[in-house]
Amino acid sequence: MLPSMLPPKSLRAVRIAVWLLALVPFLRLVVLGATDRYGANPLEFVTRSTGTWTLVLLCCTLAVTPLRRLTGMNWLIRIRRMLGLYTFFYGTLHFLIWLLVDRGLDPASMVKDIAKRPFITVGFAAFVLMIPLAATSTNAMVRRLGGRRWQWLHRLVYVTGVLGILHYWWHKAGKHDFAEVSIYAAVMAVLLGLRVWWVWRGARQGAIAGGAVPLRD
């Protein structure tokens, strides 16, 4: 039987392990950069790498609740904030690479790039939505906003997930290469679909308990 909670020492060890594992992609980029091993197109390499890890960690963050509900491992909730902050970290790197390196902080160049490649607008929107999520991730902000308002705000992560997939899909559409993004889209669909199912089932059970006549299946 899977443990619902972990002893403090075990939980601390898990959190440290997750922290280190999530840091590995960044350290890899640093090492590859220091040894001049980014390949023929360094900008494309670091942009793709940071974007990929943003999406991977976003999926991991969204997977915490389904895994907790399906396995009963309630201790998983203790690593969700860390995963979310790492998602924001890699998303920030991804954005800054485009802003500082690709566009050189040139407003005219940025506007032109957005007009030419609208998928960048979608990616920027996803990044902007992550900012309030990261800013309100502390316990102090939960208390300040109140649990219910905090939960409503953090539902923006679902919109961020959809926009992230759309950003990647739109980018790959120009190359007609949908193999990898289709995997992420399928994972995201499952993670969000489970939530929709649980909400629908809860509402249906509530209606039955209240004496309403359910619709036929």
UniProtKB/Swiss-Prot annotation:
Gene Ontology annotations for the cellular component aspect, listed alphabetically: plasma membrane
Cofactor(s) of this protein: FMN; heme b
Entry keyword set: Cell inner membrane, Cell membrane, Electron transport, Flavoprotein, FMN, Heme, Iron, Membrane, Metal-binding, Transmembrane, Transmembrane helix, Transport
GO terms for biological process, alphabetical: protein repair
Topological relation to the membrane, as annotated: Multi-pass membrane protein
Cofactor binding description: Binds 1 FMN per subunit.
GO molecular function list: electron transfer activity; FMN binding; heme binding; metal ion binding; oxidoreductase activity, acting on diphenols and related substances as donors
Cellular location(s): Cell inner membrane
Positions of transmembrane segments: 82-102, 118-138, 150-170, 180-200
Family: Belongs to the MsrQ family.
Assembly and interaction partners: Heterodimer of a catalytic subunit (MsrP) and a heme-binding subunit (MsrQ).
Biological function: Part of the MsrPQ system that repairs oxidized periplasmic proteins containing methionine sulfoxide residues (Met-O), using respiratory chain electrons. Thus protects these proteins from oxidative-stress damage caused by reactive species of oxygen and chlorine generated by the host defense mechanisms. MsrPQ is essential for the maintenance of envelope integrity under bleach stress, rescuing a wide series of structurally unrelated periplasmic proteins from methionine oxidation.
Protein name: Protein-methionine-sulfoxide reductase heme-binding subunit MsrQ
Lineage: Bacteria, Pseudomonadati, Pseudomonadota, Betaproteobacteria, Burkholderiales
Gene name per UniProt: msrQ
